[in-house]
Amino acid sequence: MTSTEGLKDSAGFCTQLVRTHDFARYAATLFAAVEQRRPLIAIYAFNVEISRVREQVSQPLPGEVRLQWWTDMLAGAGHGGVEGNPVAAELLLAIRAFRLPVERLSRLIDEHQFDLYNDPMPTKAALEGYVDDTSSALFSLAAATAGQQSPEIEHLARHAGLAQGIAQVMAALPLDASRRQLFVPLQLLEQHGSSMEEVFAGKERPTVRAALEQLVGEAREHLKTAFALLAQAPPEVRPVFLPLALTARELERMARADNDPFVPRLTSRLGTLWTLWRASRSREFRGGG
């Protein structure tokens, strides 16, 4: 196999990985500029690899080892080459081509160490820090593939990520509760007279609902701010924020009085594509050219 064939295989592997495990972000890349799709897929494939470590191990230590491999790889101290790891190979290409900040990628790995343990998310500040270094980081890295790295873009990425990340915490609540993992801030639950055990019981109670409603409300405020900042952003960077259209749809559903946060919701792939297509034609997300 030639090196060119190997790179094509790596790109194809990453595309399939993201399509399988993160269809929303995969679908969003279909509306990005052609030259951005490969680096975007590389970034999202890396995120899939890191965020799925919790699902692939039964004990924290093997998870720590896997995450450390990625940290070493980014630091240039990988145990062996990356030729056998298509995601690492594609990510390194994207880092070199678009000068992606390695520090942000490393912090994303560090934050996902929290996933390996069943310690509760203690405070809203802790949740915001976690989301800022995961969801917000992905928006920031995606913007870099459009040649946009600035304090203004970072500000936009932060609010976009907070809206998306909190929505994802809410969407994952049924699964997390079933394995006794808590990403909803314990401090927030206690402020509303609820507890970790009430969440783990998987039954909607007024105290739990009050805490979750506050969290959804804060996510919607971040989304509102993100859309206001997006309107001022360069046209070429707007398409990478297209996943916000899905976040807006989810937060609207979560805010409804008849929403049960402990009932898993499955969104059809066709519905995801339709939402993204419609949003891509709107003024908010339309790119240049």
Tell where the protein language model's regions lie, with residue ranges.
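Alpha-helical transmembrane segments of multipass membrane proteins
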Residues: 141-145
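Catalytic cores of Mg2+-dependent Asp-rich isoprenoid enzymes
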Residues: 1-92, 101-112, 131-140, 152-166, ...
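Acidic/His metal-coordination segments adjacent to aromatic residues that form catalytic metal sites
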Residues: 113-126, 201-204
